[in-house]
UniProtKB/Swiss-Prot annotation:
GO terms for cellular component: cytoplasm. Pathway: Cofactor biosynthesis; NAD(+) biosynthesis. ATP binds at residues 10-18, 128, 132-134, 172-174. The gene is Nmrk1. It comes from Rattus norvegicus (Rat). This is Nicotinamide riboside kinase 1.
Amino acid sequence: MKTFVIGIGGVTNGGKTTLAKNLQKRLPNCSVISQDDFFKPESEIDIDENGFLQYDVLEALNMEKMMSAVSCWMENPGSSAGPAALESAQGVPILIIEGFLLFNYKPLDTIWNRSYFLTVPYEECKRRRSTRVYEPPDPPGYFDGHVWPMYLKHRQEMNSITWDIVYLDGTRSEEDLFSQVYEDVKQELEKQNGL
């Protein structure tokens, strides 16, 4: 069975989850897997020399468990969407995987039909992060001492990627971002279906 897998990566608080949920509402036969659902327990998270918990690294995530969820979906795509979705005009099962380190994890490299990466400038990212509540809470200096430097490091690693990633300005409106990605996905699905 044909499937269509979308990766939505990007900076923390860049709009990944919002975009994924908006797409899921409009795309038939669509499921979402969020990388944030696969964080290891706090007791298993490393602490750096500054005392910061190292959440913004692949080692903080149970990627094997996430890959298992992806594999389960691939083996039985569309099962979570229900029978009505399977009968839709665009019956290709769609999986959206969203997270901050998707494109830095090699086992996912060959899965993407479309890849998107949301960027947000430093000041806006810091402002957005300050409005969110995390468990455990961000200690003072965490954004500048860990979160942003890790984003820059992982973003630099992405320079070696050989497949196409569409970079999106995360400061654009939710509606604009949705419209751009939705239209792009529709065109790609039509190409895949030979329409």
